[in-house]
């Protein structure tokens, strides 16, 4: 097999020199991001670093990004203390996030990011901006996260490096998906996918993750024509990765196959995902999301008995995570379960907390909750209310540009009329 040679051999040389200065082993430098063997290949110029790895190395090697990447114009510029306060703020924010205080972490990072913008420090803007968008996501501030990522993706320096474009447009796609802008999310995901080759990331973690995001967006849009092919591509690339990556690929596959009506395949991938993700390394919030997904997949397959333990586990774990949006989604799963076991009155009782509570559902989540509520109303003989809700839901689908889903909603309205 031909070795993959880096187009930036000087980067590996800088990494090796600094590592040896600090007396670090390649294993210590690798951390949990890559393997020691990968660091060896990187230092010898046979691998190119991803953006996440560059940021990791900058932190571990205690080198400014400009110096590490060779973009500084002088040694004085590389050691200028002007960004020290921002590095300290970044560290403080990391500490707050580790304690679960994502609101405080976002506050610290937002102030540091604003300062970096005022100073015109492009590398720090990128570093702090990407860190900030993660904390905004964890804090449930999706509109703020979207606005930030749109600013980052619109910067002139965001057009020059394909690896950077992969990162930015991947995150932008998730933010657009999470705020219901599904057509925009699909466009951003395809934009990022077009940069995978130039960025030399084919088959890398970033590629696997991006395919999963694209698949999820297409499923939300009910645009399923290419989903099976994309699933096969994603699973093929994921095979050579560590359990967390494989687990998430199977997780996405379980949801997608369920959407395709292939219940057996969905449950198979659900089992594979569970086997890969049942480790102490899986963040609690991710495990909570997985439990919700498992419950929904099993309800899709008409098995409320199998879904119930996952629902109950999610209800127990939910209070451990400071995430009001997740709490509402768990409640939506409860409503769906109650409908499946014939407790329509319970669904109607729960619904106001889904649509107008402290963290109401939006976008595709609200569409799904509305469909459950409409079915419950119909079962209770409140047909006119069900039809009115479905009409509002069809209009929401149009706003989300989920036109195929809107057609399905109108067909259900027609059956209620007959």
Give residue ranges: language-model regions.
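DNA major-groove recognition helix of helix-turn-helix/homeodomain DNA-binding modules
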Residues: 50-67
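Short alpha-helical DNA-recognition segment
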Residues: 20-41
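Alpha-solenoid helical repeat architecture
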Residues: 81-85, 120-127, 160-171, 200-213, ...
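Amphipathic alpha-helical segments of tetratricopeptide repeats
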Residues: 73, 110-117, 150-157, 190-200, ...
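A short, Lys/Arg-rich alpha-helix, primarily the initiator
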Residues: 1-21
């Amino acid at each position: 097999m031909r070795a993959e040679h880096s187009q930036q051999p000087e980067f590996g040389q800088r990494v090796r020199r600094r590592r040896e200065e600090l007396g670090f082993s390649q294993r210590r430098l690798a951390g949990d991001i890559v393997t020691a063997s990968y660091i060896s290949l990187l230092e010898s110029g046979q691998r190119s670093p991803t953006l996440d790895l560059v940021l990791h190395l900058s932190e571990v090697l205690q080198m400014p990004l400009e110096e590490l990447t060779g973009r500084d114009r002088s040694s004085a510029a590389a050691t200028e203390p002007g960004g020290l306060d921002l590095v300290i703020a970044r560290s403080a924010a990391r500490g707050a996030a580790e304690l679960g205080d994502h609101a405080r972490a976002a506050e610290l990072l937002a102030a540091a990011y604003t300062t970096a913008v005022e100073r015109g420090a492009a590398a720090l803007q990128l570093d702090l901006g990407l860190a900030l968008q993660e904390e905004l996501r964890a804090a449930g501030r999706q509109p703020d996260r979207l606005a930030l990522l749109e600013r980052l993706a619109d910067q002139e320096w965001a057009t020059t490096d394909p690896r950077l474009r992969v990162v930015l447009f991947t995150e932008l796609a998730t933010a657009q998906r999470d705020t219901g802008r599904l057509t925009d999310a699909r466009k951003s995901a395809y934009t990022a996918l077009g940069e995978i080759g130039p960025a030399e990331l084919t088959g890398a973690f970033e590629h696997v993750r991006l395919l999963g995001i694209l698949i999820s967006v297409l499923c939300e849009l009910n645009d399923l024509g290419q989903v099976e092919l994309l699933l096969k591509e994603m699973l093929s690339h994921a095979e050579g990765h560590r359990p967390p990556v494989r687990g998430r690929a199977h997780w996405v596959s379980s949801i997608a196959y369920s959407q395709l009506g292939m219940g057996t395949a969905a449950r198979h991938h659900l089992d594979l995902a569970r086997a890969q993700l049942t480790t102490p390394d899986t963040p609690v919030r991710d495990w909570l999301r997985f439990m919700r997904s498992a419950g929904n997949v099993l309800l899709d397959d008409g098995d409320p008995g199998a879904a119930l333990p996952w629902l109950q586990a999610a209800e127990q774990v939910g209070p451990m995570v400071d995430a009001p949006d997740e709490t509402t989604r768990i409640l939506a799963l409860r409503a769906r379960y109650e409908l499946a076991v014939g407790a329509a009155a319970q669904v109607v009782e729960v619904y106001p907390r889904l649509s107008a509570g402290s963290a109401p559902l939006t976008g595709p989540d609200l569409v799904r909750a509305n469909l459950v509520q409409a079915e419950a109303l119909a079962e209770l003989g409140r047909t006119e209310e069900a039809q009115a809700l479905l009409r509002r839901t069809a209009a929401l689908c149009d706003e989300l540009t989920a036109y195929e889903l809107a057609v399905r909603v109108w067909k259900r309205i027609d059956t209620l009329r007959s």
